A protein has these predicted regions:
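Short active-site segment of divalent metal-dependent hydrolases/proteases
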Residues: 122, 126-130
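An acidic/histidine-cluster motif and surrounding catalytic segment
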Residues: 1-117, 129-157
Length: 157
């Protein structure tokens, strides 16, 4: 993973856009990125946090497993890894998401790919806002916040 880098200066969306989407070793673009940006900004404002930048990097299981092994010393597949670069309430970080896991989890949970992707994307933002999910109480709070955020998505034009 010598090529791991901060994604805030890449050319895709430009450094002026605080929410950027990239793909690493896969061909993927989220549906309706403009709507997703407005939604994420609304959630961050709802959490009374300050957005500096969030980079979403969509990848496959292999890529995310390597990050998990190298940076977290976990030898397991995961759907998301969030790297915060600032303490809350400042939102600044990279969110790596395995599209392979999103497909599999959507099937397992009986939801659409888009629903699962939205939940995982906002899960990363909530980590950057300061929410944890290490113990049962924190997991319950995180799920509640995800549900609130998903309801906010319905209010975004």
């Amino acid at each position: 993973m010598d090529d791991f880098e901060l994604y805030d200066d890449l050319e895709e969306d430009g450094p002026s856009d605080p929410i950027s989407f990239f793909a690493e070793e896969i061909d993927f673009e989220p549906a309706n990125p403009a709507l997703l940006r407005r939604w994420i900004q609304k959630v961050i404002a709802h959490e009374k946090a300050e957005l500096n930048f969030v980079n979403y990097i969509f990848c496959d299981d292999t890529y995310l497993l390597k990050l998990n092994q190298e940076y977290l010393q976990h030898d397991t597949l995961t759907d998301i890894i969030t790297f915060p670069y600032h303490d809350p309430p400042v939102v600044e970080g990279d969110v790596f998401i395995s599209i392979d896991r999103i497909h599999e989890n959507a099937h397992q949970f009986g939801v659409s790919f888009e629903q699962e992707l939205n939940r995982v994307m906002i899960h990363g933002v909530l980590h950057l806002c300061g929410y944890e999910d290490k113990d049962p109480a924190d997991k319950a709070k995180m799920t509640q916040k995800e549900d609130e955020a998903l309801l906010l998505l319905k209010t975004v034009d």
